[in-house]
């Protein structure tokens, strides 16, 4: 019996050694079938809407911010210099709610802003100084009053000034943005809520990136009324929302 037991131990030991010293085991790497690999769209392929509000803060700003909050949408505010007590709170709310503050002008007075290239940058720098000192905001994103192809650019006396402004903006490291959809709300306070909504809808034209011009002005109450419908329609059309920064595809008039 002892001999048989020793033989059994010998055989089992030999088997274990064979297993341990045999061919190395094959490592199997799990792979995700190609058909279920998630597809991630690049930013260029996505439908993105940039809601932009010029000329604020105004007495409408808080209502605009509340609507944006309700729809979980972030926007870009091209602001003026406004040092009224209510405006100071508006700047703070824009920042705390995650919106982008960009540069428009301090005065928005064409007779000052477009008097000369030097006058433009004095006005712009005044706005920059206020925003940085009071709110810690630094921005290199600019929308010049009236846009880069405004009516003054077509006048012989002011065309060189505006061309010089655009050139120096680039040289100084700013990025200027125009728009590719005009809501028409800036034409007059009498522009109706429905006209504003329709102008935005018509402007979409299957564009993937839409930069929508809206205004944040005391008298433009219909912009506030139109905003929920504008957002809802953009969502139905498959747009997501983003704010403008240095990486945003440029939209500039030619």
What positions do the PLM features span?
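Catalytic domains of cell-wall/extracellular-matrix polysaccharide-remodeling enzymes
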Residues: 108-213, 217-233, 246, 253-254
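Active-site beta->alpha N-cap acidic-glycine motif
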Residues: 29-119, 123-138, 233, 240, ...
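Terminal accessory/targeting
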Residues: 1-50, 66-75, 133, 180, ...
């Amino acid at each position: 019996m002892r001999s048989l037991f020793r033989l059994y131990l010998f055989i089992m030991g030999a088997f274990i050694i064979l297993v341990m010293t045999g061919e190395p085991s094959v490592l199997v790497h799990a792979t995700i079938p190609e058909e279920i690999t998630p597809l991630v769209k690049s930013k260029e392929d996505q439908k993105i809407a940039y809601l932009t509000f010029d000329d604020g803060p105004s007495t409408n700003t808080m209502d605009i911010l509340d609507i944006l909050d309700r729809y979980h949408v972030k926007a870009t505010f091209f602001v003026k210099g406004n040092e009224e007590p209510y405006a100071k709170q508006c700047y703070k709310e824009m920042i705390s709610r995650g919106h982008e503050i960009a540069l428009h002008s301090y005065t928005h007075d064409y007779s000052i802003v477009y008097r000369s290239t030097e006058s433009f940058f004095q006005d712009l720098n005044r706005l920059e100084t206020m925003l940085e000192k009071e709110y810690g905001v630094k921005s290199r994103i600019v929308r010049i009053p009236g846009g880069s192809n405004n009516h003054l650019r077509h006048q012989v006396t002011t065309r060189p000034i505006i061309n010089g402004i655009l050139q120096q903006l680039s040289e100084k490291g700013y990025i200027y943005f125009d728009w590719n959809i005009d809501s028409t709300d800036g034409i007059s306070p009498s522009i109706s809520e429905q006209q504003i909504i329709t102008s935005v809808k018509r402007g979409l034209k299957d564009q993937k990136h839409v930069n929508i011009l809206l205004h944040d002005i005391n008298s433009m109450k219909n912009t506030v009324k139109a905003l929920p419908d504008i957002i809802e329609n953009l969502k139905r059309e498959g747009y997501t929302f983003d704010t403008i920064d240095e990486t945003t595809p440029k939209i500039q008039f030619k």
